[in-house]
C-alpha cells in the first residue's frame, strides 16, 4: 500500500493583533519671546504742597556810636581896643 499524494495547502492565517504603541516623543523647544509692549500712559500730576512755615524773627541791633567830629577853623580876629585918650 503506498501513501497518497499530499493534500492542498491550508488557508492563510488571520492577521495578528497590533503591536504596542511607541514611547512618547521628546518635548518641543520653547517658542520665541514676543515683542515688547507699548509704553504706558503718563501718571497724573501730584497735588500742590503746603506753604512753608514762617521764617525766624530778625534781630534789631543798635549801631556803634559815631566818631568825634574834627576841630573847627579858628575864629576871626578881635576888634581893636578903645584908645584911653579922651
From Swiss-Prot:
This is Collagen alpha-1(XII) chain. Keywords: Cell adhesion, Collagen, Disulfide bond, Extracellular matrix, Hydroxylation, Repeat, Secreted. Residues 1-86 are annotated as: Disordered. The modification Hydroxyproline is found at residues 6, 9, 12, 18, 24, 27, 30, 42, 51, 54, 65, 74, 77, 80. GO terms for biological process: cell adhesion. Residues 16-25 have a biased composition (Gly residues). Residues 1-12 have a biased composition (Pro residues). Belongs to the fibril-associated collagens with interrupted helices (FACIT) family. Trimer of identical chains each containing 190 kDa of non-triple-helical sequences. PANTHER family: COL_CUTICLE_N DOMAIN-CONTAINING PROTEIN-RELATED, COLLAGEN ALPHA. The triple-helical tail is stabilized by disulfide bonds at each end. Prolines at the third position of the tripeptide repeating unit (G-X-Y) are hydroxylated in some or all of the chains. Type XII collagen interacts with type I collagen-containing fibrils, the COL1 domain could be associated with the surface of the fibrils, and the COL2 and NC3 domains may be localized in the perifibrillar matrix. It is found in: Secreted, Extracellular space, Extracellular matrix. Residues 35-50, 57-71 have a biased composition (Low complexity). One of its GO terms (cellular component) is collagen trimer.
